[in-house]
């Protein structure tokens, strides 16, 4: 359907670009389905086409196992012009060669890392120090991290102070506040020119979707389900009854809400010194009330949405 962008998103895009050119850690955070990966791709493509920076991207999919050497390797692969790329195993030699490689390119460098909420704090600390190593030699290296809101909350933790205070964080709200406009735009983009949205979607149905859903991913999924359900029972336009029948009843429950923010059972158990079984009982509303209150207070203090 193309790319939908609000005025707020357009301004944020400009602000992110400016921060990237400054040579620092930049974090873009947002819930699942809000458009982080799409924004990251657009940033990468725009910077690459402008030609003022050299852009690099980590392709490693196992982010929980991704270490600083893995990300440095991504820089070597994207910056080197040699046919055979040899990355030194010795840390001192590796960093020196990378520094020289960046100086040789005579342009600022930006490294893009998606799903960065899974990176270990030692990896994030290493990236911060790598930026400083490059800066000391007169070069500019920016690292652009994209991840769930967990990344933003982690950067605020006391143990992450060294990195958090030096990171420019952008919270991507996506289409929040513009859901109705997004639905109407999406329908117009996906139908033939003379189709009116009211012919296939009741105004009340649009309002219900806009009220209950927050992200493009949620809206696209539920619109597809609604059109399929309406087709099966030969109903046109789609009504609120159809929408209610396909809306997930658990969409705003605690577990899916925290999942959209990047938290799972094991991660929550580790962060709040709880047993996985306690977290599962909390999700089901079956945990002992005093213990439930204790965990909820800790989670609220850490910035989790309860």
What feature does the model see in each segment?
Residues 101-123, 127:
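Conserved P-loop NTPase "ATPase switch" module shared by AAA+ and STAND
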Residues 1-26, 305-306:
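A short, basic N-terminal segment
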Residues 62-85:
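Conserved NTP-binding/hydrolysis module of P-loop NTPases
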Residues 188-192, 196-306:
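C-terminal alpha-helical "lid" subdomain
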Residues 107-109, 126-200, 204-206:
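The catalytic "switch" region of P-loop NTPases
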Residues 46-55, 80-83, 135:
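Post-Walker A helix-loop "phosphate-sensing" segment adjacent to the P-loop in P-loop NTPases
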Residues 32, 55-65:
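A short hydrophobic beta-strand->loop->alpha-helix junction that borders the nucleotide-binding pocket
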């Amino acid at each position: 359907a193309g790319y939908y962008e609000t005025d707020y998103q357009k301004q944020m895009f400009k602000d992110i670009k400016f921060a990237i050119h400054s040579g620092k850690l930049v974090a873009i955070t947002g819930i699942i389905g809000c458009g982080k990966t799409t924004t990251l791709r657009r940033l990468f493509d725009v910077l690459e086409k402008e030609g003022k920076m050299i852009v690099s991207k980590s392709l490693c999919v196992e982010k929980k196992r991704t270490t600083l050497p893995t990300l440095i390797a991504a820089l070597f692969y994207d910056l080197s012009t040699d046919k055979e790329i040899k990355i030194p195993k010795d840390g001192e030699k590796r960093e020196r060669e990378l520094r020289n490689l960046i100086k040789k390119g005579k342009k600022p460098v930006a490294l893009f890392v998606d799903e960065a909420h899974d990176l270990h704090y030692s990896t994030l600390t290493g990236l911060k120090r790598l930026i400083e190593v490059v800066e000391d030699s007169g070069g500019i290296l920016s690292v652009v991290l994209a991840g769930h809101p967990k990344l933003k909350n982690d950067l605020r933790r006391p143990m992450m102070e060294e990195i958090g205070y030096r990171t420019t964080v952008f919270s991507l709200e996506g289409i929040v506040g513009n859901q109705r406009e997004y639905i109407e735009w999406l329908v117009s983009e996906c139908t033939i020119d003379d189709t009116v949205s009211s012919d296939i979607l009741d105004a009340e149905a649009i309002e219900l979707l806009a009220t209950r859903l927050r992200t493009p991913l949620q809206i696209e999924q539920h619109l597809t389900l609604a059109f399929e359900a309406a087709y099966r029972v030969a109903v046109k336009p789609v009504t609120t009854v159809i929408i209610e029948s396909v809306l997930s009843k658990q969409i705003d429950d605690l577990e899916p809400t925290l999942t959209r923010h990047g938290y799972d059972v094991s991660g929550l158990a580790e962060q709040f010194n709880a047993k996985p079984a306690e977290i599962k009982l909390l999700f089901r509303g079956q945990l002992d009330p005093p213990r439930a209150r204790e965990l909820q207070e800790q989670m609220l203090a850490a910035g989790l949405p309860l």
